[in-house]
Structures are given as structure tokens and as C-alpha cells.
Amino acid sequence: MSDITHKMNELSVGDGANRASGAAAGGETPSGSSGRSQYVPPHLRNRPNGGSTPSRRGDFGSRSNGFGSGRRGDFNSSGFQFGSGRRGNSGFGGRGGFGGGSGRYNSPKPGVGQWVDGKHEPAAPNERLEKELFGVAEDPSVQSSGINFDNYDDIPVEATGDGVPEPISAFTAPPLDPLIVENIKLSRFTKPTPVQKYSVPIVASGRDLMACAQTGSGKTGGFLFPVLSESYMNGPDAVPESQGAFSSHKVHPTALVMAPTRELVSQIFEEAKKFSYRSWVRPCVVYGGADIGTQIRNLDRGCDLLVATPGRLKDLLERGRVSLSNIKYLVLDEADRMLDMGFEPQIRHIVQECDMPGVESRQTLMFSATFPRDIQMLARDFLKDYIFLSVGRVGSTSENITQKVLYVEDDEKKSVLLDLLSANDNGLTIIFTETKRMADNLADFLYDQGFPATAIHGDRSQYEREKALAAFKSGTAPILVATAVAARGLDIPNVSHVVNYDLPGDIDDYVHRIGRTGRAGNVGIATAFFNRNNRNVVKGMIELLSEANQEVPDFLQKISREGSYGSKGGFGSMRGGAGRGVLGGGSRGGSRDFRRSGGGFGSSGSSGSNWGSSSSGNGGYRSSSNYGNPSSGNSWW
């Protein structure tokens, strides 16, 4: 990793401070100048025929098969949806899956347990299914504990509320059910992360939970482990008596997990399959952009844990295909992101206006990377006597990530990117752009330069996105160009490098992006291309780098002193009366339990306890600069 950083330091992109002042880049000479040779980028040096790149299309197939043009990413992704004989079949049933039908009431299927006469009867172990679900110990695509994982024990945790239970220090039964402990061992996870140490006993004691935790801290396991464990021990409720002609087609899940994006719910579902192995609980996933008929057929096979995006779930509720009357556990994952995406009306309709049990009759777990005013209001309405959990410095990036900021003008970005990719030829790389057109353009450019790349963005179909992600995870296309659709929640093991080709306008988006590397205690590199077009986030960049003990380039300090940055993404911008504060530092209340502040919402005073105050300065919320990210994927990080 240090070799890569050293190579980046040597990149001939000119001195940032000089560029900031408008000076020409050192080492570049017009072709007509005498006495100085023309600059040749490192990725073109030592190549025959003037640096021409031999075509590698024969190695990776034509453009129509994957890495180029509009059909880029068309890779074989069979097995991306486990237990499915047809594309997009995302339930446990189906050909090759955990078995169709009702595993709870009919004859048992491989890997599917039963609940019989008030007792949980786990299925017998199945070697084939275990290999498909958990892989093998030597599988590099399975990421468990990283080299810095023990450092997580030093992360401070603050749990507030009445009667906070003692945290656990290991995955043991009790308090966990023996089956979930076995499945955790199969996943090769040896110790709980800080959020899991607290969430397991909190849920086991019947309490509600509002949790903020730093990126890569195991939030998905933080709710799946205790919810599944309690489900195994307590079993399902009886299905209500039929009412109406179509009531027999309804499913009555015990647990509901809502998350904002297709990618995130798919990854949570993949993890739920692992940890529900051999149990009576059958997980299902539903999301927009995929065939609803296929998803309904999966639901008809049985669904005990439903993972859903709010829009598709609302559609299924209106069709009479899902009943929430048996919900014991409600989980809102990335709650702040769901509200940012405009899902609050759908969420409130689902929770408050459908047949879901009231707040006193269910357990509610809310996980949010940030805690602005609208999330506080949601917690007030959806949770009862909850415990507030703040893990680590939620408002900062992980020190496992080495951050490097390069001053690069827009017309030089492609050349510098090729230099970076040439220096970092190991591991997976994610490149973030701001627009869909740039994502496609850049992936085509990289392909033409001999770098196998694929892209995902909002205009690609779910099938295309799944195939592109499958190719990236497998290493067939080790470079993924992505827009913000993949910035949050997307968890892919062994991502060693994240490049912000285009910096976002908000600092919290930057932190969520670079959080795709350095996960589970592993180390990673994040490179950002900065120029004067990004001066609106310069203050936030400086604070981030300082908090994470990273080098702050001189050109950032210089541009910051000019005082020419704007409010978007900087400090001082407000959203609905409350900015998005940096969490976890000193008197800044972003990751604190607002119930202790006594300041209420939207007060105008100047005390640090005023939440969302328009005049509270550093004592209240500030602009978009809080971060942290729940995730899931091939691991539960």
C-alpha cells in the first residue's frame, strides 16, 4: 500500500499550489520547444510503437459482451441471486434454492428448518448449500476480519437511555440462539464489532434502538443477528384468519427491513440467507426496477423476513400481497438516506397507516449514518423508550483509509487516472463520477486503453447492474465506474482503491464514497481529483483530512484562505432549518442523544444543545459533513 502512495506522490501533475495560482504544470513542454523532451505519462512509457496499447479485447470479449459501449457489463451472473433457476428470482424457493413451498408447514427442504409444536427444528447441515452460501475458507472474495480489526476494541461507544444492558464480548449462546452462532462461525467472523456488542443485548431485552456508527462497523449484522436470533427462539405468530377472496395469497412476515436502494436491499437479503440457513425463517427481497410478477411468486413460496425498498413494498401492500399484521421487528436501515431520497411519505404510510402493529407492540431498530432534525422526528414517532447508540467518531472517516488529494484540472483527469491505475494493479478499484454520461464515457475510455472496466448508474436496468456488479466482484472487470447510486450501502470485499474522479458537492457524500474501501478493519486508498471547481468543499476536506490524521495539501490550505468557497456542501448551509452536522466531536451534537440536550427542535439560541438552530454556530448542526455507512453484501459489513 505504501508503494502505491509513493508512486502517487511522484505523479507528474504539477504542483497544486502553482496550479491554484494559474502557473503552468512542470514537465510539460510544447512540441516545438527545444532542449526538453515531450512529457510521456508513466502508463505509456516503455511501450513499443510510441506507447500504443495492444488490444486486450480478445482477453475479455468484444464490446457487445461487456466492457465497452452501451452493453458494457453483460457478464454471466448466474448465482448472483441464490436459489434461483431464472433471472431475478430472489426468494429461497425456486430451482436449486432452499426449497419452494412452505418450509414451516410442509415436508422439510434441504437447508430449511421448521417450527413445529412451539419448537424450532433446524434442518440438517447441507454441504452443498454451505459452500454456495459461505464459500470456502481460502476464497478471497469473502472478507471477514481485516488486519486492523482488533483496533475496533478501542473505538469509544456511548449508549444512552434507561437501563442500558451490558454489552457482549463474543458470539455466544446465550444471549444468541445456538443456530445463529453456528452460522456466524460458518461466515468466519470471530468477534462482534462495537455496534453488535450492544445491539444484541438491546434487542434481546426487548428495547428499541437508534444507532449511529462509523462506516464499515457491521451495522447489517447489528440488526440481523439479534432479530434472527430472537425469531428462532420465539417462533412465528399464527396467521390471521382469512378475510376476503384474496387473503390466502398474502404473506405475513415476522420481520421487515426497509432500505433505500435496490443494491442495499439485495445485499441485506444475501446476508439474511446466510444467517437464516437451516432455520424456519425464509427471507425474501422486493425492490423496484425488477419484474414484480417474479417477486410475487417468490413471496407466495413463503416469507418470514422481508427486505424491501419503500416504493415496491407500498405497491405490494396496495395489491394485497403483503400483510404487516404479524410484524414483531421493524428495521429502518440508512434512514437518513431514505429521507434524503424523498421516501418519508411512503415510510410513514407503511408504518402508520397500514396494518402494522403500533409502536408499543413491536420492536423498532433505526440505523442512520447521520442524525439531523428529520431523523430525530422520525425516531420520536416510530420508537418507544429507545436506547441511543453512538459508536466511534461517526462524523469522520476511518483511519484505515489512506486519503490522497491531487490537484488535477478537468482536461488532465483521464491521463492522471491512467497513471493511478497503472501504479495500482492489484485489487478492485471503484471510480466515482457525478454524471451517468461521464460514467459511460470513462468506462469506454478505460476499455480502449486496455483496462477492463464496467459501469453502473441509474439508467441501467437492474439486470445490467447485477451483471456489472457480478463481473466486478469476481475480478473479471476489476474497475467499476459508478455514480452516486453505488456510493452508499454497496459493500464489495477487497476494494483496495477508491477514486473520486469528480468530487461530490457534499462532504458527507465524499465520505460515504471512500467508505467503500478500508472496510471490516482492512486498509485501503482513496484518491480525490481536486481543482478550483471543488472549492465549495475545501473547508470540509481540510477538516476531514485533519480528523483522520491525513496529510493536508498546501493547495487546499491556500484556497481555503481565499475564502471563496460557497455554502453548498461547505459549512453553514441549512436544510429544513437544520444542517448536516459533523458527528461525534466535542460539543457538536450530531451523534448525541438529542433527548439529553433539552433544546428541542429548531430553537434559535446559541447553546450547543440547540438542535437545528439557525444561529448556533459550531454548537449546533452544520452543513453536509456527517457520515458513516451501513452496508452489506458478500459480508455483513
UniProtKB/Swiss-Prot annotation:
Function: ATP-binding RNA helicase involved in translation initiation. Remodels RNA in response to ADP and ATP concentrations by facilitating disruption, but also formation of RNA duplexes.
Species this chain originates from: Meyerozyma guilliermondii (strain ATCC 6260 / CBS 566 / DSM 6381 / JCM 1539 / NBRC 10279 / NRRL Y-324) (Yeast)
Record family assignment: Belongs to the DEAD box helicase family. DDX3/DED1 subfamily.
Protein name: ATP-dependent RNA helicase DED1
Annotated residues for binding of ATP: 213-220
GO cellular component, one term: cytoplasm
Major enzyme class: hydrolase
Residues in Helicase ATP-binding domain copies: 200-389
Short sequence motif named DEAD box, residue ranges: 333-336
Domain notes: The Q motif is unique to and characteristic of the DEAD box family of RNA helicases and controls ATP binding and hydrolysis.
Catalytic activity: ATP + H2O = ADP + phosphate + H(+)
Sequence motif: Q motif, positions: 169-197
Biased composition (Gly residues): 85-103, 567-589
InterPro entries referenced in this protein's UniProt entry, alphabetically: DEAD/DEAH_box_helicase_dom (IPR011545), Helicase_ATP-bd (IPR014001), Helicase_C-like (IPR001650), P-loop_NTPase (IPR027417), RNA-helicase_DEAD-box_CS (IPR000629), RNA_helicase_DEAD_Q_motif (IPR014014)
Enzyme Commission numbers on file: 3.6.4.13
Biased composition (Low complexity): 14-27, 75-84, 606-637
Gene Ontology molecular function: any one: ATP hydrolysis activity
Disulfide bridge partners, by residue number: none
Domain Helicase C-terminal: 400-560
Protein location: Cytoplasm
Region ranges (Disordered): 1-121, 567-637
Keywords, alphabetical: ATP-binding, Cytoplasm, Helicase, Hydrolase, Initiation factor, Nucleotide-binding, Protein biosynthesis, RNA-binding
